[in-house]
Amino acid sequence: MPIYDALSALPNGEPSPWGDPIKISYGQRDVLLYAVGIGSTDLRFTYEGHPDYSVFPTFPIRWGGMGAPIDEQHIPRSPLPLMIDAERYLSVEKPLPLEGTVTLQSRIVGVHPRGKGYGFVECETLVTDLDGEVCVRMANGSFRRGVQVLGDIEPFTGSGQTFSSKIEVPGKMPDVTLETRISVNQAQIYRLSGDYNALHVDPAAANFGGFEEPILHGLCTLGHVANMLLGAFCGGESKL
């Protein structure tokens, strides 16, 4: 069975070195397509001619962990159907440009066991603009559900820090209840923003990953929730 050696990957529990900078360029079409992919109908995010047109805050979420220097000798790669987004954190320090080029740098901060035969790899990512100013800080956890087959990672000792924390459900009624309708072809739309994991569209890939049918991207669900919360509590206003 595949073995994770987290102690060798992250000696003394320290984060890995930052990966090489990655340049990412995006345009108006990318911004609009992402907004539609998370169910937004707000013209501030879906119409470039709106006077307050802007990039939806979670637009860069899918870049989390890109370029992180993962030592595959110690942390073997999992096929995409056995990898799913587990947890995300995003802090917008400065609105992203409406279009242009940004720089990403990522590093590994933790590798820990999760359940029987699974692993959890966490990364930290910074997104900076052309002036070198940080626009977005992100942390993401990737749930590795196997390397060769579902749940085949040997038990191992974790290393590094974790951003993961248990969320206690308040013992009171919710302040607000929100509902939305997700289209049956939402995964096909959302994947056009760059997440082409077959788990979300191909029944065979979904079965390999242990699911009866394709599942919606977790980041698409996150985007829908962010869209609802932004509308309910901020009037759709995303600017700092």
Report residues per predicted region.
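Hydrophobic, proline/glycine-rich low-complexity stretches
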Residues: 1-103, 229, 237-239
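A contiguous, surface-exposed recognition patch within enzymatic or periplasmic domains that forms
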Residues: 2-49, 158-221, 228-231
